[in-house]
Design a protein with these regions (language model features):
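Conserved alpha/beta-hydrolase
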Residues: 63-96
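N-terminal cap/lid segment of alpha/beta-hydrolase-fold proteins
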Residues: 1-43
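Alpha/beta-hydrolase-fold enzymes
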Residues: 132, 136-224
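Catalytic active-site module of serine/aspartate enzymes centered on a nucleophile-bearing elbow/loop
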Residues: 277-337
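Alpha/beta-hydrolase active-site loop
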Residues: 102-123
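Short alpha-helix in the alpha/beta-hydrolase fold that links the catalytic acid
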Residues: 246, 259-270
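Active-site glycine-rich loops that stabilize anionic/oxyanionic intermediates
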Residues: 50, 55-61
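Short beta-strand/loop motif that positions the catalytic acidic residue
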Residues: 244, 250-252
């Protein structure tokens, strides 16, 4: 189907380096002209006027998938950044092979997203930083050491794929694919050749195993294996989620086999410092037959779903008269407005 909605304006390619030296690449949509400040550092001429929104992708979904949504935000006055986690898309190793490439969900949050947060603070000084997070991108929000700088968060289908939370009618199929077949492929091939299977982008072994072996408690996923954490490190990991004080809107849809109510709220319980709102939407409420886990960011939903995210980014409140029903809400100790 051809997109006829928001035109994906040409963004600027960006390249940064995570704390461990891994290159992270993405794209930025900027308003205004850049100028040289102290020591020749380039800054935006409109710094401090508009927020910058970082889009955290789902597991092994390329950042280019979010171009039209980012262009939509840009058209409404926001600067925007999309990026690929290490091993994916623009941030895939230049050798192209993922065999033996080391990466996990922890790396994506503690190193990659952290690098993007620091980039936003440096390149857009004085501008509020908001985040739109898809699927595991919501987990990534809680992992970054600088996540306290985030002003507002919108999550779509955000969870960490604990198998007990999958939609009942799809649980056996999903268990077979994601928790049996995927880890076998990862171990045998050294990565998951997911593109050949039509699943998603090729996926680093460590990321695939983080998903396949995910426990009821997120931190327990890292009790053993190549990315094992000590007990003290797991305690610090949980505490990092609490550093987020941004109000969070968690959107889920009734036909998302990953983003069930238990899955969404399992993750939300980690964000103890945030005001939380869980908005659940049925496709019929917007006159559509389906939405699912991925389609929220398709431009056919520009007029029906994207304004929900936009309203939250603007005011930290739900869009008046919008679709869906609030199934969970909790006040928090938010220091952002």
């Amino acid at each position: 189907m051809q997109d006829t909605k928001t035109t994906a304006l040409e963004p600027e390619a960006i390249a940064l380096v995570a704390a461990d030296g891994c290159p992270i690449r993405g794209f930025a949509w900027r308003h205004g002209e850049r100028h040289a400040g102290d020591c020749g550092v380039m800054h935006e001429s409109n710094a401090g006027v508009r927020p910058v929104v970082i889009v955290n992708a789902a597991t092994s979904v390329r950042c280019r998938y979010y171009f039209r949504f980012a262009a939509f935000l840009f058209s409404h006055g926001y600067d925007a950044i999309v990026y690929d986690y290490r091993g994916i898309g623009e941030s895939r190793p230049r050798s192209r092979s993922l065999r033996g490439f080391s990466a996990s969900w922890l790396d994506w949050g503690q190193l990659d997203f952290e690098a993007v947060l620091q980039y936003a603070a440096r390149e857009f000084p004085g501008q509020p930083v908001d985040v739109v997070a898809h699927s595991v991108g919501g987990v990534v929000v809680g992992l970054a050491p600088s996540n306290e700088m985030i002003r507002r968060v919108v999550m779509m289908g955000a969870q960490y794929a604990h198998w007990r939370d999958y939609a009942p009618g799809r649980k056996l199929v999903m268990l077979w694919r994601w928790h049996v077949l995927m880890p076998v492929l990862a171990i045998l091939a050294g990565y998951v050749p997911a593109r050949r299977l039509g699943w998603m982008e090729d996926t680093p072994k460590g990321v695939a195993l983080s998903w396949s072996y995910s426990k009821a408690r997120f931190e327990d996923t890292f009790r053993r294996g190549a990315f094992a954490l000590s007990e003290a490190e797991r305690v610090r990991l949980v505490a990092q989620f609490s550093a987020v004080h941004a109000p969070i809107l968690a959107i889920s849809v009734t036909d998302d086999e990953f983003g069930t109510v238990p899955a969404i709220e399992r993750l939300l319980r980690y964000f103890t410092g945030s005001a939380l709102t869980h908005l659940r939407i049925a496709p019929r409420q917007i006159g559509q037959p389906a939405i699912g886990h991925f389609a929220f960011f398709h431009s056919r939903f520009e007029d029906s779903l994207w304004p929900i995210a936009l309203a939250w980014l603007k005011s930290g409140a739900l869009r008046e008269g919008g679709p869906g029903s609030v199934v969970f809400q909790r006040a928090g100790s938010s220091t952002h407005c």
